Amino acid sequence: MAAKSDGRGVVTGFAQLHNLDEVVGTGEDDARNGSSFHICHCCNTSSCYWGCRSACLHYLRAKGKGEGKETARPTPEERLWLDCLWIVLALLVFFWDVGTDLWLAVDYYHKQDFLWSGLTLFFVLVPSVLVQILSFRWFVQDYTGGGLGSVEGLSSRRAAASLQRDKCCRLSVWIWQTVIHIFQLGQVWRYIRTMYLGIQSHRQKENQRRFYWAMMYEYADVNMLRLLETFLESAPQLVLQLCIMIQSNKAEWLQCVSALSSLLSLAWVLASYHKLLRDSRDDKKSMSYRGALVHLFWRLFTISSRVLSLALFASVFHIYFGIFVVLHWCAMAFWVIHGGTDFCMSKWEEVLFNMVVGVVYVFCWFNVREGRTRYRMVAYYVVVLLENVILTSLWYAYRDPATTDAYASLALCGVFLCFASGVACMVLYYGVLHPMGPRLRVLASSCCAELLWGLPLPPEAEPMAPTPGPRGSQATPTRGLTGEYAESDETATDTCLPVFQVRSTEPVDAAGRPIQPEGPFIKIDMPRKRYPAWDAHFVDRRLRRTVNVLQYISPNAAGIRYRDGPLLYELLQYESSL
């Protein structure tokens, strides 16, 4: 959502700048000489290892010979309002989903359909109460012992009057948060506060870093809460309303609106959460809003197809529907466990997390592993397609023709057309709009897109043997378009001297300059998390207590050092709850 630091204690704004998209020069005067520094989409880094065979080098030379047209990019102000609009739309989707469900429950009650009214209300209130309890617990962790409350005791310069005033303010905050969560508005408040902190991080020059920290943590919290509530409330609600419409052989407009709101909420939360994953990672390129919109339609169509097939099957086979869901959940959970995830601190927590992911896999694809996902995603969608075919075929064979002939053909077409449309949107996203560049590329030169003008191109050179490194070290392995490192002798001897190494052994900023830690840094005796995990969210929350202390007692930037490497990441670039 917001900007990263530039390595010198300056936050550029509410928009994403941590991948150097917004610091690109015009290139009007330097296009003929090309550039020797660019953002490489094939090796996940902002510096490439350029040899004679490098596609990046050929692309830059072609770019410098007359293709140096600067692509239009939104200004920081435009990005700010796009971010605000994204949050406002998330709030509207939230209110629409909850409001239509409550309205429908009241409508069932007036029609004396007490069973449907009770189930509809149950799937609204119970998930909301659980999420509000978790949200309030996080507030207590952040605001009590070890959190913000412990910071006051570290400063002896505060006067007694100031401490008394702070106590009154803290009491007001406690009362306000309690009332907010009692009325089930904790997520709404977090969305509003995220937008406020993002705007302040863009406008407040003196306190940008503190506003950015608070905004980043708040946005991560509200996305995690919305993801949890959506799969506890919207997914069961959608299946329930479709089953009611199919069993009663009629669809009222309020039922359709409620089902559409639940469907949109599922798709929106998944797209928003996926965008958050990339925006919060310093080693990932942020997702554009065009990519997020296509991702939204991908989820919208695939979930529609899945839920419609489940509802059709459940309208005829009540008991077998429950058996099918349990079997599918067990198979998906076993598949995830067999894949060897490494999210949680203990084995049993890991198994529990994988079981929760298995529930998500009943409705849609959800990536839980770092690395290539192509084959796993294809396998999942092949299984889902086969299941949808079997479920709809059984429904069509055992349905009551007298009551279903009016919509049977439309239902079958809807299942398979929605699935095909969702797969088409997925291919469009990965083929054209993926943040790391087109995944379905034919030309190798399409892996690189963004240029930083002003530096000379490496000269044309003949293949030569690499110069031995210090102390006779081996040649630095190159990283190809597939993301794998090549260490063969042929690669080492048939390349030019490297201009940049793929992975620097020293902490460097965006321009390749060594970063000298200005202030204290936190040592974490664990590997850096490579993909989001529920347990990592709580690890991050425990770190916040130290963060809240350091930002008050130290005027300099704090850093985080992980066990698995010497790279020093600024505190602002730490992936919150991921």
Swiss-Prot record:
Membrane topology: Multi-pass membrane protein
TM annotation in the entry: 86-106, 114-134, 253-273, 307-327, 348-368, 377-397, 410-430
Annotated GO biological process: apoptotic process involved in development; engulfment of apoptotic cell; phosphatidylserine exposure on apoptotic cell surface
Keywords: Cell membrane, Membrane, Transmembrane, Transmembrane helix
One Pfam assignment: XK-related
One GO cellular component term: plasma membrane
Entry's localization field: Cell membrane
Domain of life from the UniProt record: Eukaryota
Chief location bin: membrane
Alphabetized InterPro entries for the sequence: XK-rel, XK-related_scramblase
Family the entry assigns: Belongs to the XK family.
Listed name of the protein: XK-related protein 6
Organism of derivation: Tetraodon nigroviridis (Spotted green pufferfish)
Lineage start: Eukaryota, Metazoa, Chordata, Craniata, Vertebrata
Name of the coding gene: xkr6
